[in-house]
Amino acid sequence: MIDRLIVAPPEFQIYRDEHGNRLPRPFGLPICLLFTYLCNTSAGYDLFRKPAFNTAMKTLLDSWGLYLTTKDSAKLLTDCEGGWFSEEALQEFESDSRGKFEETYVCPDPDAVNRGFSSWDAFFTREVQPNARPVEAPDDKSVIHNPCESYLHCIARDVKCHDLFWLKGNIYSLYDMLNRDHKLAKQFVGGTIYQGFLSPVDYHRWRSPVDGTIKKTEIVAGTYYAALPDAGAPEGNQYQAAGDLRGALKRSQTWLAMVAARALVYIEADNPDIGLVCFIAVGMVEVSTCEVTVKRGQKVSAGSELGMFHFGGSSFVLVFGPQACITFPEDVVLGKHVKLNSILARVHKA
């Protein structure tokens, strides 16, 4: 079945029950859908963490990623059912005040059905219009800007170098997040973490949250479909009945920051009250590539590109040291879509 999936572009599809209610199945992520129940089992937990499995899966996803750069991969960039410019798809792309597609994103040919994108990858990694997501308060150096169009997943304070991150709950272990680099991890002990989640319809390039200098970049090999098995969806979930076993990957986002394939970008902020910041791009499910586009020693401004995801759902983490007194606006809350380059937080003098 997977052999058939990786020689075709993903379809856009929202799944509904017999009453028309939306089901919690990921759209545009066919392998994730295939593994959705297996992820939430002890056997899946063991299998999907095995290095040999993830090496093989990376090879497969890289092959699919190569196909998604071809002209043939653009054949579902249509307005037909299952197409990424269908009426239902555009409603998703423009939901949560994201804005009209052609006004928000750079389209090579805005009047064409496929908007002029030459491949599915070109469509997925599309650029944002310069005026659609301006950097808010660019001259205020106390501001930390949102590096990815996303939703809040978690804010954690007083983070530890080592912690029991395999337990349920929002527990972070800096040593494991930062690829077991104890020297770097100890610089962030006692600091603050912000983690956000990107929808498949979000903008998937990363921008710098601050003015500063790139100190180090690193690509970390990891898992793609591993999740922490649980008892299913909690009470009060908008799309799932309590106990529905699907969605374990999304519920495991904190844990994935320690184990998933990811990219680390360390930035020394020009503002000493902020200090060293680590941006972590966390690959989830059909993400075969975290591409870093900056190099060590490079100067960046808030809003400068750091890199991008190629295909899939994804997450990101910002890690601040203990010297950074970080506060978040009242409107940064669970469930609210936070726009790229908007004010995510502020740092105050201790």
Swiss-Prot record:
The protein's GO terms of the molecular function aspect are: phosphatidylserine decarboxylase activity
What biological-process terms (Gene Ontology) are attached?
A: phosphatidylethanolamine biosynthetic process
Q: Per the record, GO CC terms?
A: mitochondrion
A Pfam family matched by this chain, by name?
PS_Dcarbxylase
Pathway listed? Secondary metabolite biosynthesis
Q: Which organism is it from?
A: Amanita muscaria (strain Koide BX008)
What are the top taxonomic ranks of the organism? Eukaryota, Fungi, Dikarya, Basidiomycota, Agaricomycotina
Per its record, how is this protein called by name? Decarboxylase iboD
| Role, per record | Decarboxylase; part of the gene cluster that mediates the biosynthesis of the psychoactive metabolites ibotenic acid and muscimol. The first committed step is glutamate hydroxylation by the 2-oxoglutarate-dependent dioxygenase iboH, and the last step is decarboxylation of ibotenic acid to muscimol by the decarboxylase iboD. The order of the intermediate reactions is somewhat ambiguous. IboA likely activates the carboxylic acid at position 5 to introduce an amide bond, and the flavin monooxygenase iboF generates the N-O bond. There are several options for the latter step.
Q: Which family does it belong to?
A: Belongs to the phosphatidylserine decarboxylase family.
Write down the EC number.
4.1.1.-
* Coiled coil regions in record: none
**Keyword hit for Nucleus:** no
Induction / repression: Expression is highly induced during artificial growth in symbiosis with Populus, which is close to its natural condition.
Q: Is the Lyase keyword given for this protein?
A: yes
InterPro entries, sorted: PS_Dcarbxylase, PsiD-like
Instruction: State the UniProt keywords alphabetically.
Output: Decarboxylase, Lyase
